């Protein structure tokens, strides 16, 4: 039967198995005579066909190629069986179950599942096998024979399939490609396991809880946490005496070995250990995908798709294994007696389990060494970094602590004491954690050498595996053997090339089932899944902070070690990450690779570009909770929040009371009043002090009442002018200079005549209430002119002279002119200079409810006057010439009213008395009207009534108004003074074709007045009335006067713009 099995397994079993079967068919059958010997290796065969088939193993010849796929075979029978895999033909059916097979040998192997026959028994350890290929492979574990060497490296293997898989390392061949993401693998089993990432299949379910797993090894390791029966491969022989004492329990042997390291060694010398058993290498076979899992391990019930996979699977002693005579002696050996190596089987602890999974992150490994290397990434090696809160145990790894704490959870749930050693899988001897002689901590290089044995000779960097060192050496040599065919970019490993090629294909094969995001790479996909689950399996051994991947943990460790391995070659500055170094090098190179698509600005970082792009849009994700302003950056918001609190007031540290009670420093800013009337000039760029009227809604008082005012800064932004609160109070403005005290005197060339002078209006600025100027009419009437006083020592004084337009009655009004003379010394006379609007530093906004209407009052007499400049020279009482100059002012500040001079003129002494009376006010105000902020000329009558006139500049006259004769210098523009409502304009039809004029209403004289000698008599009180031109006194009643405009040219255009 063994010959048939060997012959039928010539292609599927390893070549050495067939050869060995012909050479040594098994202990139950005698070996046939060997007639044909191989000249290469000396092996002998009974048939020439076997020798020919064997020689193709040395030459690598595979003459039989499949027409449907690239596979080739050494024998025709292997090709025949392989083609049945394409056609689906399975002519051999099991009589006990519905399964069918493509070759008779597979059926015979399958029949052993039903019969349970184990015909091949090992003479050294007594293990029994169902198949000869497993038996031959097992014999090589005892002999250490590896007859299949690699021609490219010194490695050797126990069967040809393992050698073929190893050859892929040198050739880079990955024949099994995923149809979804294009990732390729060297073995079909790896491809099937990978495809579960896309399908979400988790076929291995725990019978004790609803958890599912993608690998059976993960399930087996998980079942140990439930306290189930010991999994295959766990300790079955009697442990050493030290381990039989009650102690800590671990899930797998790797945790125990790592836990034993901090313990001090026992005082007596340890007995010599038995010879180390030969542990088979674990590899996954490249089986055909159409074959079902017909090969099942009797120890762990794990199924395999081919005999080679089952052969490579670690043999597990099953419950149906026959008792071995050498299994256990009648009496357990003593502690000082070494166990007999031959009669006993190899120590089971040395045989790894089918798979080892990392508890924190779920990764699985085929060997204990692989799991041990991986677990160093979860915690600090050496030292007791993790301590159990339920007992005094401490562990160097987080995984060990998690496995240990599961024991306490099970004990609490069952209400029983901790499990004893005989019920445990792996037992730790209970020794004191702190030995009598404290063990000094290992040097910093010791853990690295223990955990990372492969060290680079160039830079001293260490690695866990030889492949990591090999890839690292390519950084020093610059070797990039894997080149992209699309763009020519080269990489040091094939996996990096496969990842890079997705940039050209755009394939995003990994899709999140919760949010629908797709990813190109599995690592990004796994990291994204942890964002949903909140899982952070990688914990820092120093501070306990956890991370989602190992790279973040490695970068974080630089914080504790202070390591900055990446140094700049230009300035020597070092960095913890290569990305920071690349960004820093742009400072030296001037590279700014990130360009804004909306403007020519460039940036060195993509984050700066994203922040800049918010300035082009209305996006302001960071909003102030106090005033509602938005900002593009959180730093800008934090800086803005400081403006709401006074700089010298510390933030409140008391707990806020229940309810909407803001902190004390921000009480005034958090609770604005119910209504605010704030009007800001749109062109002003200055510090504004806004007085805000309080409403009904008031903030709760938490301290001294804050002033109901706030200083703002008006700033021009892309969205327009914005008010920004300023915590810096503006300096107190200096007090205004004392206004000059002026009086209008008739010139020395005054004509003869009697009569009393009429008292005209007075001009008053906003700064001086109750101050005034006396206007004396001359022979030519009243006019407006700017002149400089000849008697004044100072220069640049701006004066106002009134002159009549038309001739009037003989008397003081017909004097040639009047002169504005200061009452104080000339240095004290100040000139009012109006600055441009952008130089105004403080603006006091008036309430919007100010009166803006014009009330026209009737008068008894009408005198027509027109405002115009006067050219030429004027004479004064001293006889000196007064040179006229272009006026720079519209308003003249005057002194107090009590210092006004009154009395008869030089030629009027004794003719009558002049009465002081109440003079009229003239001032400018900035008022809020329906049309916005406007400058208004306010005329106050003798009886306290006010008339407001608006001032504006125009290029052309409106209909119905005629331009006066140009008497001033060239370049004059038009200034319109109109009533504040300005709802109607006077046209020629309303006035009979005349021109709009300004009239003075002069009442009859009230009697003589006394005054200083040498001064003319003061005129009587007058009122200003706006009437249409051409209308005589008494022709039109004052109540029916419409709103009109007065046109006057002024040479100083910039003065108009200040209002």
Swiss-Prot record:
Keywords: DNA-binding, Metal-binding, Nucleus, Phosphoprotein, Repeat, Transcription, Transcription regulation, Zinc, Zinc-finger
A GO BP entry: regulation of DNA-templated transcription
UniProt-listed Pfam families: zf-C2H2
Start and stop residues of the Sequence repeats: 818-831, 832-842, 843-853, 854-864
GO cellular component labels: nucleus
Positions of the UniProt region annotated as Disordered: 226-247, 260-280, 312-351, 644-674
Residue numbers spanned by region Interaction with TAF4B: 943-1059
Composition bias, Pro residues: 263-279, 336-351
Single GO MF annotation: DNA-binding transcription factor activity, RNA polymerase II-specific
Zinc finger (C2H2-type): 36-58, 64-86, 92-114, 120-142, 148-170, 176-198, 204-226, 356-378, 386-408, 454-476, 482-504, 510-532, 538-560, 566-588, 594-616, 622-644
Phosphothreonine: modified positions: 199, 589
Tree of life domain: Eukaryota
Localization of this protein: Nucleus
Chain spans, region 4 X approximate tandem repeats: 818-864
Record-linked InterPro entries: Znf_C2H2_sf (IPR036236), Znf_C2H2_type (IPR013087)
Biased composition (Low complexity): 228-237, 323-335, 644-658
Keyword Transmembrane helix applies: no
Primary location: nucleus
Oligomer status and interactors: Interacts with TAF4B.
Summary of the function given for this chain in its UniProt record: Transcriptional activator. Binds DNA on GT-box consensus sequence 5'-TTGGTT-3'. Plays a role in spermiogenesis.
Name of this protein: Zinc finger protein 628
């Amino acid at each position: 039967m063994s010959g048939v099995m060997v012959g039928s397994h010539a292609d599927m079993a390893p070549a050495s198995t067939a050869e060995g079967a012909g050479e040594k068919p098994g202990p139950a059958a005698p070996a046939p005579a060997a007639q044909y010997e191989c000249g290469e290796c000396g092996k002998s065969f009974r048939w020439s066909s076997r020798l020919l088939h064997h020689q193709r193993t040395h030459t690598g010849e595979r003459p039989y190629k499949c027409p449907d796929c690239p596979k080739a075979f050494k024998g025709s029978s292997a090709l025949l069986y392989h083609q049945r895999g394409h056609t689906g033909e399975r002519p051999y059916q099991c009589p006990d179950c519905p399964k069918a097979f493509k070759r008779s040998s597979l059926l015979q192997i399958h029949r052993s599942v039903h019969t349970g026959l184990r015909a091949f028994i090992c003479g050294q350890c007594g293990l029994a096998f169902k198949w000869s290929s497993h038996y031959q492979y097992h014999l090589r574990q005892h002999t250490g024979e590896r007859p299949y060497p690699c021609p490219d490296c010194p490695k050797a293997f126990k069967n040809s399939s393992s050698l073929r898989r190893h050859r892929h390392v040198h050739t880079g061949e990955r024949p099994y490609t995923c149809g979804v993401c294009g990732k390729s693998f060297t073995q079909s089993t790896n491809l099937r396991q990978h495809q579960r990432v896309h399908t979400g299949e988790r076929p291995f379910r725990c019978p004790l809880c609803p958890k599912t797993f993608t690998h059976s090894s993960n399930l087996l390791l998980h079942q140990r946490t439930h306290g189930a029966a010991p999994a295959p491969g766990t300790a079955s022989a009697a442990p050493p005496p030290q381990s039989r004492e009650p102690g800590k329990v671990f899930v797998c042997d790797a945790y125990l070995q790592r836990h034993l390291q901090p313990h001090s060694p026992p005082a007596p010398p340890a007995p010599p250990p038995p010879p180390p058993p030969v542990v088979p290498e674990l590899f996954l076979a490249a089986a055909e995908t159409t074959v079902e899992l017909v090969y099942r391990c009797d120890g762990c019930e794990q199924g395999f798709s081919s005999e080679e996979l089952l052969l490579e699977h670690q043999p597990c002693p099953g419950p149906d294994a026959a008792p071995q005579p050498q299994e256990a002696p009648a009496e357990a050996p003593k502690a000082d007696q070494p166990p007999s190596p031959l009669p006993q089987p190899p120590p089971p602890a040395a045989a790894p389990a089918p798979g080892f999974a990392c508890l924190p992150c779920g990764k699985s490994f085929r060997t204990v060494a692989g799991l041990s290397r991986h677990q160093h990434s979860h915690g600090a090696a050496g030292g007791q970094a993790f301590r159990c809160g339920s007992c005094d145990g401490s562990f160097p790894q987080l995984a060990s602590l998690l496995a240990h704490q599961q024991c306490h959870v099970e004990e609490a749930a069952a209400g029983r004491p901790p499990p004893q050693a005989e019920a445990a899988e792996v037992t730790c001897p209970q020794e004191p954690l702190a030995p009598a002689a404290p063990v000094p901590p290992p040097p910093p290089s010791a853990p690295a050498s223990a955990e990372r044995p492969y060290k680079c000779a160039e830079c001293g960097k260490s690695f866990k595996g030889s492949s990591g060192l090999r890839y690292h050496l390519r950084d020093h040599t610059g070797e990039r053997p894997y080149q992209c065919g699309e763009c020519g970019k080269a990489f040091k490993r094939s996996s990096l090339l496969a990842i890079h090629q997705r940039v050209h294909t755009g394939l995003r094969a990994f899709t999140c089932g919760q949010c629908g995001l797709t990813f190109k790479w599995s690592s990004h996909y796994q990291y994204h899944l942890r964002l949903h689950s909140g899982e952070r399996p990688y914990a820092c051994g120093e501070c306990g902070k956890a991370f989602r991947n190992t790279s973040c943990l490695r970068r974080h460790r630089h914080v504790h070690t202070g390591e900055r391995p990446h140094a700049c070659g230009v300035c020597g500055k070092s960095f913890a990450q290569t990305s920071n170094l690349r960004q820093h090098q742009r400072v030296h190179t001037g590279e700014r690779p990130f360009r804004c698509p909306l403007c020519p600005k460039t940036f060195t970082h993509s984050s700066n570009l994203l922040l800049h792009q918010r300035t082009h849009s209305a996006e302001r994700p960071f909003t102030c909770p106090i005033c509602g302003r938005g900002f593009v950056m959180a730093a800008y918001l934090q800086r803005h929040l400081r403006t709401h609190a006074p700089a010298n007031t510390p933030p409140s540290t008391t707990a806020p009371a229940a309810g909407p009670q803001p902190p004390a420093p921000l009480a005034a800013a958090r609770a604005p009043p119910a209504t605010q009337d704030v009007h800001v000039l749109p062109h002003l760029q200055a510090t504004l002090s806004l007085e805000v009227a309080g409403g009904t809604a008031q903030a709760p008082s938490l301290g001294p009442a804050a002033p109901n005012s706030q200083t703002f800064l008006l700033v021009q932004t892309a969205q327009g002018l914005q008010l920004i609160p300023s915590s810096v109070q503006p300096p107190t403005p200096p007090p205004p200079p004392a206004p000059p005290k002026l009086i209008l005197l008739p010139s020395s060339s005054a004509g003869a005549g009697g009569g009393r002078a009429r008292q005209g209006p007075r001009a008053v600025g906003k700064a001086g209430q109750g101050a005034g100027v006396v206007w004396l009419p001359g022979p030519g009437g009243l006019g407006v002119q700017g002149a400089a006083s000849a008697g004044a020592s100072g220069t640049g004084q701006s004066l106002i002279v009134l002159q009549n337009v038309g001739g009037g009655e003989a008397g003081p009004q017909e004097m040639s002119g009047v002169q504005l003379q200061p009452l104080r010394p000339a240095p004290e006379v100040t000139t009012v200079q109006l600055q441009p609007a952008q130089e105004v530093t403080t603006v006091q906004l008036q309430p919007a409810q100010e009166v803006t209407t014009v009330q026209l009052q009737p008068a008894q007499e009408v005198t027509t006057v027109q405002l115009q400049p006067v050219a030429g020279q004027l004479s004064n009482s001293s006889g000196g010439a007064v040179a006229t100059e272009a006026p720079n002012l519209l308003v003249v500040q005057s002194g107090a009213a009590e210092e006004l001079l009154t009395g008869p003129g030089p030629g009027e002494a004794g003719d009558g008395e002049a009465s002081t009376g109440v003079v009229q006010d003239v001032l400018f105000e900035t008022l809020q009207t329906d049309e916005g902020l406007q400058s208004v000329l306010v005329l106050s009558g003798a009886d306290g009534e006010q008339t407001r006139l608006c001032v504006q500049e125009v290029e052309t006259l409106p209909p119905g108004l005629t331009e006066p004769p140009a008497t001033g210098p060239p370049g004059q523009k038009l200034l319109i003074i109109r009533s504040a409502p300005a709802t109607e304009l006077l046209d020629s039809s309303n006035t009979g074709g005349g021109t709009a004029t300004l009239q003075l209403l002069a009442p009859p004289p009230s009697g003589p007045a006394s005054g200083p000698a040498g001064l003319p008599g003061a005129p009587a009180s007058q009122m200003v009335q706006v009437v249409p031109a051409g209308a005589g006194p008494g022709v039109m009643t004052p109540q029916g006067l419409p709103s009109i405009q007065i046109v006057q040219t002024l040479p100083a255009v910039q003065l108009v713009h200040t209002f």
